[in-house]
Amino acid sequence: MDGHTNGTNGSCSKPCEPLTDYCIPDYILNPDSEQVLVDQAPCCPVVVFINSRSGGQLGSSLIKTYRELLNKAQVFDLSEEAPEKVLHRLYCNFEKLKSNGDPIAFQIQSNLRLIVAGGDGTASWLLGVVSDLKLSHPPPIATVPLGTGNNLPFSFGWGKKNPTTDQEAVKSFLGQVKKAREMNIDSWHIIMRMRAPQEGPCEPIAPLELPHSLHAFHRVSGSDSLNMEGYHTYRGGFWNYFSMGMDAQVSYEFHSERKRNPEKFKNQLTNQSTYAKLGLKQGWFAASLTHPSSRNIAQLAKVRIMKRPGGQWEELKIPRSIRSIVCLNLPSFSGGLNPWGTPGTRKVQDRDLTAPFVDDGLIEVVGFRDAWHGLVLLAPNGHGTRLAQAHRIRFEFHKGAAEHTFMRIDGEPWKQPLPKDDDTVVVEISHLRQVTMLASDPCKSKSVNDPSSPMCCSNHDDDERNSLEDEDEWEEGRKKFGAADTFKFPDEVDVAHLS
């Protein structure tokens, strides 16, 4: 990048020559910097956000490497600076420079790509920030897997294993970012409303002291159009999934344990092992003898769906054994498993189901009975209990059904108290808009606009042995599953991802 060879004028840290395709000059990043002459804009300018608390020590190491290879001013530690402030400052500067006739600013803004390294919650945080900016041409986002589940990176071909942090690995990743294709995905709006209680708390309880722990789900102000007198209203958004029930409870316990003992969570393998142990402890592999109502979705809430835009609300019957319900937008949950799968031809005809796309305005609703049910996903054509595809879904909580429930949005769990004397607690999910991701090969997500995506469902007849959607068949199957002396998990299966 000719024209900014001085360190004060935005040079990349050495060695920088091979990476001029990505480096952004200081005067673009910092409005107070002196403008310098730049002959040519980088062809793939990137701004990098890294959660230094993710991946044990990997986050901090990754920051160091990116700052060695790029302009330090374009690499941000999310524990030190919020992305909304960074991007607001950057885009305000873009507009100022473009109004002054700067062609470099125009080219960099047009070609800008964002990189976010962290867990699914971190990636969702950045997606929310970009959505909130409401830009006419929002920058597409690439995700570096640096968490426990890494569902978002896996969905778009970036893998699910935590990366190495040496310079060659980072250079290779940047090369993939440059070649990656853009893919739109649906954004989902979530609103929760409850009557203001006479006594007792009803605020969502955040298990993590991170700046974004409940960024995607916060209480609306009194002036917000969604606010209603006498009610507490919360709003947020998600891109991968919303879940409620036992899986969210296990996730909550994991995050709480990590907060209490951070020194025990230094690598991905340890984290996954701890996750599996907590699942066993919480009864996710074996239902409690007392069958508490908080673990049975049907006893907890009535569920209604609207199948298509402008359609009618209709009640969705939930089998009594379902202890976890997942509203899924992407084909990756619990570390890369696909709970929806691809419905067979008979299912399509009988139940009006379609192949899952990430940009079709529909969300897949899947139920799980317990973690053993999750093991079905490992079988060919295996899937959870397909409940519905919907444009909107509403949970109406029964009065006094439970003191609390557990919820999770894109990897961020919380314990949600419920007022005992209120039968008006409602959670509603609806399609909002779309954001743009960067996809690399092999990409699990499918777009309705991609000619290579299957526009119809598979020819298999949906192997009922794997779905076990009949209650009696499930009970009999559960007694037998895993009972043989020769039964064992395949070597490549990580049991931590089955929760």
UniProtKB/Swiss-Prot annotation:
UniProt-listed Pfam families: DAGK_acc (PF00609), DAGK_cat (PF00781)
EC numbers, comma separated: 2.7.1.107
Region listing for Disordered, in residue ranges: 442-479
Induction behaviour: Induced by infection with the rice blast fungus Magnaporthe oryzae, and the inducer of plant defense responses benzothiadiazole (BTH).
Keyword Protein transport on entry: no
Disruption phenotype: Increased number and density of lateral roots and decreased thickness of seminal roots.
Catalyzed chemical reaction(s): a 1,2-diacyl-sn-glycerol + ATP = a 1,2-diacyl-sn-glycero-3-phosphate + ADP + H(+)
UniProt xrefs under InterPro entries: ATP-NAD_kinase_N (IPR017438), DGK (IPR037607), Diacylglycerol_kin_accessory (IPR000756), Diacylglycerol_kinase_cat_dom (IPR001206), Diacylglycerol_kinase_pln (IPR016961), NAD/diacylglycerol_kinase_sf (IPR016064)
PROSITE patterns linked: DAGK
Keywords: ATP-binding, Kinase, Nucleotide-binding, Plant defense, Stress response, Transferase
Keyword Kinase listed: yes
GO cellular component: membrane
Polar residues biased stretches: 446-456
Entries under PANTHER family matching the protein: DIACYLGLYCEROL KINASE, DIACYLGLYCEROL KINASE 5
Similarity comment: Belongs to the eukaryotic diacylglycerol kinase family.
Miscellaneous section: Plants overexpressing DGK1 exhibit decreased density of lateral roots and increased thickness of seminal roots.
Function: Phosphorylates the second messenger diacylglycerol (DAG) to generate phosphatidic acid (PA), another important signaling molecule. PA is required for plant development and responses to abiotic stress. May play a role in disease resistance responses to pathogen attack. Modulates root architecture by regulating the ratio of DAG and PA, which have opposite effect on the promotion or suppression of lateral roots vs seminal roots. Suppresses lateral root number, but promotes seminal root and crown root thickness.
The protein's name in its UniProt record: Diacylglycerol kinase 1
Gene source species: Oryza sativa subsp. japonica (Rice)
